Amino acid sequence: MSAEKISISLPKELYRELEDFITRKGIPDRSKIFQIALRNYLDENREGTEIIYGIINLVYDHEEASEALTEIQHEYKDNIISTLHLHVNERLCIEAIAVKGEKSKLVELNNRLGQIRGILKARLLISFPYEKT
């Protein structure tokens, strides 16, 4: 793998947190942490029309949200690949929705889901396909 060396400055407290994290987790390669963090940041802020993949993580009260949630999922059936549903307790559920499509469409879906009454959390984690470098 071809790589460029760069230098960064961190506030002392952030640097100490990083070093503590590396020590606790036994991570041998500090560069890998920055590569992953930078890819995540760039993915979150990238614009474009290419097809991307992602997971929408929902936490919700099923008594309030189930009907509207199902309705919206049917509207976006071309973008939803699969869902995983977990029961937390008698009322709360967690749902992980695997999605595929243009970023703008997935953000729109996440925003619509987040507006449903009873949705406590709606978070989109996106991933652009990368060639291995």
From Swiss-Prot:
Binds 1 nickel ion per subunit. GO terms for molecular function: DNA binding; DNA-binding transcription factor activity; nickel cation binding. It comes from the Archaea. InterPro entries: Acetolactate_synth/TF_NikR_C (IPR027271), ACT-like_dom_sf (IPR045865), Arc_rbn_hlx_hlx (IPR013321), CopG (IPR002145), CopG/NikR_regulator (IPR050192), Ni_resp_reg_NikR (IPR022988), Ribbon_hlx_hlx (IPR010985), TF_NikR_Ni-bd_C (IPR014864). One of its GO terms (biological process) is response to nickel cation. Its cofactor is Ni(2+). Ni(2+) binds at residues 74, 85, 87, 93. Keywords: DNA-binding, Metal-binding, Nickel, Transcription, Transcription regulation. Belongs to the transcriptional regulatory CopG/NikR family. Transcriptional regulator. This is Putative nickel-responsive regulator. It comes from Saccharolobus islandicus (strain L.S.2.15 / Lassen #1) (Sulfolobus islandicus).
